[in-house]
From Swiss-Prot:
Keywords: Ribonucleoprotein, Ribosomal protein, RNA-binding, rRNA-binding. One of its GO terms (cellular component) is ribosome. The gene is rpsS. Signal peptide: none annotated. The keyword RNA-binding applies. Belongs to the universal ribosomal protein uS19 family. The keyword GTP-binding does not apply. This is Small ribosomal subunit protein uS19. It comes from the Bacteria. Residues 1-25 are annotated as: Disordered. InterPro entries: Ribosomal_uS19_SF (IPR023575). Protein S19 forms a complex with S13 that binds strongly to the 16S ribosomal RNA. One of its GO terms (molecular function) is rRNA binding.
Amino acid sequence: GHKLGEFAPTRTFRGHKKEDKKVKR
């Protein structure tokens, strides 16, 4: 996973929709 997705959920769910659940928990 990408830890930077925590403070950058915008590019996270935008680049990885599968990790969207990880960011939003």
